[in-house]
Amino acid sequence: MVKKIYFSVIQNHNVIKKVINSLKLAKTIELVLHDPTKDFFYLSEMPHSLKNADLIVVKVRNECSIDLLHFAKLYNLPTLHDVDTVLLCKNKIALDYSLRKIFEKYKDTLEKFLMPRSWNQSLADVSKFKEWALPKLPIVIKSHFQHDKYNRFNFLVQKIDDVDIFCKRYKQFLSYDVYIQQFIECDGLEIKIYVIGDKVFGIKRENPIYIYLRDKPENIDVSTIEREKFEVTEEIKNFSKILSTELNLKIFGFDMVCPLDTDKFSIVDLNDFPSFRGIPNVEKDLKEYIENYALNL
């Protein structure tokens, strides 16, 4: 039996390109590709290839990606991740709420893991924000939403004058609420955990914030940071399984750091369908999971 997969994704790096090429060669799959930055719709006549798909897989890039998932929900079309799951991952505040609820529910199981202090705030009144932020420094200001790379930022505030730099650099965002995390002093490394079904992978790389603190570059291309394998522990595998179940995620990743004053891990970010850069031959696992998921529907 041949299953039709409607795959909405930008072919912008080798992992995705290899997954697509492998799915094209699979005798059990008919693959329809959609680029959310180029392929748009006549809304009263959505394509049959979408309506008749056995599975819709979306690697979210922009609002067009979200629109597809809304359409799928309205017409009860099968998706790898549904719109509610993706919207939760997109919204850092809602995701924070959900993660804290998970930590509370599994507090006896997740003793090895922490969440940093966090807040939502506004910089519409900069003086008021500075007064609020001063006793909490250092902090990291993050964009409220995370799927659109043109509207996404992580900004370290060590001293209160750094707020002025943020306001100058991101002045178009001052009327929006932002997500703020306590800055976690760590060993300078960032651990990235990737999950595909019941398979869990790990890499470690230099933390971009620590690169900035050391070198003060104008920009940091995180894709060029060297990555090494990280041995995934049973505690991390169990944590991954809990996140998958509670957040209804099949393919996802999360970032952790190791605070200097404890042997625990602090989770600082989570994404649906991440890049998987640095995992050898991961395209094989992704292809097999997506293919098998479609065949088992």
Question: Predicted segment positions?
Answer:
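A short glycine-rich, hydrophobically flanked beta-strand micro-motif that places a catalytic Asp/Glu
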Residues: 181-182, 191, 249-261
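Phosphate-binding site of ATP-dependent enzymes
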Residues: 152-244
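C-terminal active-site "lid" helix and adjoining low-complexity regulatory extension at the edge
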Residues: 245-249, 258-297
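Active-site nucleotide/adenylate-binding loops and adjacent lid/helix of ATP-dependent enzymes
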Residues: 8, 86-178
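Protein kinase-like catalytic core scaffold
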Residues: 139, 179, 201, 252, ...
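Conserved N-proximal alpha/beta basic substrate-recognition cap immediately N-terminal to
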Residues: 10-121
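Extreme N-terminal starter segment of soluble prokaryotic enzymes
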Residues: 1-6
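Short glycine-rich anion-binding loops that position phosphate/pyrophosphate groups of nucleotides
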Residues: 61-63, 144-146, 273
